[in-house]
Each structure stands twice: as structure tokens, then as C-alpha cells.
Amino acid sequence: AKLLAAFDAIAAQTPLEQQAHYAGLFEMNKRYTLYMSYYKMTDSRERGTILAKLKMMYEMFGLTTVNSELADFLPLLLEFLAYGHFEGDARQQDIKLAFQVIEDGTYTLLQNAAADLDDPYFQLLQVVRATLRTCVETGVVAS
């Protein structure tokens, strides 16, 4: 229900309003970035290590990024998890890094957004976070 309500709220906007809303939240505001390791590590060397590990994980599973997004960009992480074929793969354990980065990043993002949690984008993030947590707790991996 929460997922559909968020989609409906976003769909009620014109495409131009959707773009302005998204850009205002995530592209023009450091407080609400979708780069998941930024919150914990900002621009430290440790963040560089995480970005390199994520990139290696993508490559290990055959994903080559064609855009200039950093490896910790939430939509990229979610796309990797959604379309990856991990079931029965001995390297399945390696995708835990993606879950950890998303868990850490969305936790801080939603803490920063406490005053704006009624925004449909943050409602979507809450659903994503809860779904991924359920996957981790039950041992279910995208396939």
C-alpha cells in the first residue's frame, strides 16, 4: 500500500514537476544524496576503497557500467540486485557488500529526512529498505 501510494503521488505530477522535485531533493542537496557511502565516509580514502570493491563486485558478476555514476549510487546498486543472477553462484556471498552499503546509506538518508518522511521519494526508500532487510533476514537473494 505504501509503495503504491508513493508511485501514485509521483505519477500525479507532470514530468517537469517530477524532474524538479527529484533534482531538488537529491541533486541539489548534500543532505539527501543517493550516493550511499557518502554519509558514512564522505570523501575519505575508506570511501574510495568501498567504491573500488563495489566496482569489482559488479565486474565479477558481468556488469559493466556505461555511465559515469559512482558505484555506490543507489539506483545502480538496486538495478544490480534486481537483475543479477546470483542463485546457486558460489560468489553469492560477495553481494553482501551491496546490501551493507545500502543499509548504511539509507539509514542515514532517512534519519536526515526525518522532517520530510511524508515525501513520496522517502516513502519509496522506506519500502526499499524494509524489503532489503527482509531479504537479508530470510536469506533470500535476488535471482
Model segments located where?
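Charged, alpha-helix-forming regions
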Residues: 1-143
